[in-house]
């Protein structure tokens, strides 16, 4: 649902409110799926949780595969719903791939930092705010860095937006 929300909000005319819709969608997804899968929707965050030792490699790999497959499927759904002719031309925001990569690394780091400290820290066991913190982090980073990189902060989303022609394959 995350890539579906990204594609529909950005291409469907949400304008400046798109990051709010995307952050809210992620928050809802974390609350809805957190008790089932740990709320793993981002391969970079899954890797961070693996490094922290909260999941095993045998758990992480299927999550990562599912994340990319789901993002790709959602991208094709968006293309069908909106129409290929209404999808944007391939581009990196501001045309500077190095700056875009740095922005993505920083935004992804911020997201992983928040996830590790609100959703996997022993001191926060049983908290009920982690979805809000995670969703607001994505919203904040999208507003702060989105004009530089497009604001994916998630390798699976980056694959999805490439299929939707919102970013060029060579810039992932």
Segments (PLM) and residue ranges:
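Membrane-interface helix-loop junctions and terminal tails of multi-pass membrane proteins
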Residues: 1-172
